[in-house]
Structure formats: C-alpha cells, structure tokens
Amino acid sequence: MAVKRYNVRMAGLGGQGVVTASHILSNGVVISGGHSSLVPFFGSEKRNAPVESYVRISADEIYEIGEIIYPNIIMIFHPSVITLGKSYTMPFYTGLKEGGVCVINTGKPIPFTKDEQKGLEVNNTKVYNVP
C-alpha cells in the first residue's frame, strides 16, 4: 500500500529560511492538487536561535495541527542542529518513522555519535548530505 501522507520536520537556525521553505513546500502541494498544513515553531530570538517547522502533506484533507512527533522526513538546514544540539527536538532523529529520510544541508558527512548512528540504523534511516 502506498503512503498517502507524509510528515516533514524541518530544523535549522533563525534567518536560514526554514519557515519560508515550509511555506514553499506547503503551497507547492496545494497548487498541485494535494492537501497540506504547516506550523512554524520558534522562540522570540531573532537570528541563530533554533527554528522548527512542521509540514503535513496528504492526498486527503488534514485536520491535525501542531508539532509533528513522528515524521517520515527530517530536513536539517544547518549542521549545528546536530553537532551543537541547536534544536527543540533532541536527538535530532527522535520520532523518525522506520525507513524515514534525513536530508542534511552539508557538503560533507557529519560524524554522528555512536548513539546517533545506532538510532539511525535501527530505523533503517536513509541519510542524504546535500550541499
């Protein structure tokens, strides 16, 4: 059975465009005939503070709002979300569904801790580093 719904969690730092990217993704889904909802989450700080945004994508109507606890896809906009723990959700892969995807904005692979590596392997997570 094909997946009819995707939950995307985006994490980065203030000023990187995490919220803008979630709006673009959500609007693209709606324009193409799908259903989408998004919820940005950030503090009162301006730049370099943790930012998360949650996008739900579905072929059917969406009634849920709020934080996505169990995403299919995690997008990391800055390596420090992982290396310095600059995220509201730690460790960064928390809740990722089995067979999930993690896209990291970096030109070279990030050295994960043993616990992070084990957590990703247990879930059969595909990690992509995209510069």
Specify the residue positions occupied by each region the protein language model found:
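Active-site cofactor/cluster-binding pocket
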Residues: 1-131
